[in-house]
Amino acid sequence: HVQVLSDILTALGLDPDAETPGRKVVRYLGTSLVKTMELASRCADPQAAQIVAAECVTLAETKVHLNWELIGELAKKATAEESALLTPAYEQVEREEDEHLYHTAGWTRELWIQALGMPAVLPPPEETRKVDTAIEAAEAKKSRTASAKVTTNTKAKKASAR
């Protein structure tokens, strides 16, 4: 998706490599998320480090998701020439970015649920279903309750059989 944005910027006559205040902030945030994951990997048990990593990825995906929503809004208000560049890129990438966000959020939720000692659904329903929209994500999240009960009952039966 970086290449898609670079191509758009170039076509608009902008330098995709220009150092801007926004670019500096994004770099700082990204570096901070990576350092956070590295710290958790060194200092925490594997389960906690995995949750930290999932949260960091979810934070990053949330920002990327917002950026593509903004590109979509810009495409609606742009000149015809700008819109001709922005709209196809938005349509190509935005749905994939939705999927990334919903899947990472599902993993983060289930890892936390597991860490709190409750029945988790791993992989999460967002991962096992084709979840591309907020409605589909809500339906997948809602379905996890039934899946968690099945998982709990199966584990209980296996434990009592021992």
Residue ranges with predicted function:
Residues 5, 68, 86-90, 97, ...:
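Generic L/I/V-rich hydrophobic alpha-helical segments across diverse proteins
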